[in-house]
Amino acid sequence: PNQIWQAEQQKYPIIMNGGYFVMGAGKSVSLLCREGEVLAVNSQEEIRSQKSYYPTRGIFQLSKNGYFSTDWAYTTTDGVTYTYEQPSPNKSGYEPQPAPSAYFPTRGVKLNAETAIGGGPILLKDGSVRNTFIEELFDEESGVAPESYHPRTAIGVTANNKVIFFVCEGRSVTEGVKGMNMAMMANVLKSLGCVDAMNLDGGGSTCMLVNGQPVIKPSAGAQRAITTAVALK
């Protein structure tokens, strides 16, 4: 994030880490849409017990009419990204659901966002706690550790379309601060007035800069090189 702050000539007062990526390779495995162009997509396939699953994972988007929301999304093999009102009901260890399409798991809506970031799981949707880490295949094997305490990053929106950027420390970098799990984050974001909210990459990636200054201590002792970020202009 500090490199982004410097490269963008300090024009973003708030910068926060974004979606998931392959460490070392710099490849995003979360959706990224900027100025209406999809630059990366959410993971299209996850392998569990030698079976292929096709999860609908979360995105946080700004529509072209100026409203923020969380949605479950999937990009098909022909390159079309659809959003859905409900996630595909996958569960690791059970028979995989069909690959999402224009009509499954619900009627899909073609992504028409001004900007969007992928992550997951979705924590809140339409004012209700959802925490769909099971359906999105964000299990322990994914590395997200949804039920364990770690540094976390999330983004949400209130009923009056105000965006909430959220980070928390963890792993006892500050004595006694162990972090949060997904259930705790969902409740905290709801208490802050969010009606929609989504988890982003956490752990050693968690970082927020306000006017170039970090607001929490990184769990690894220094900022991690990340692939995507969310910034307030």
Question: What feature does the model see in each segment?
Answer:
Residues 1-233:
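Gly/Ser/Thr/Pro-rich low-complexity, intrinsically disordered segments
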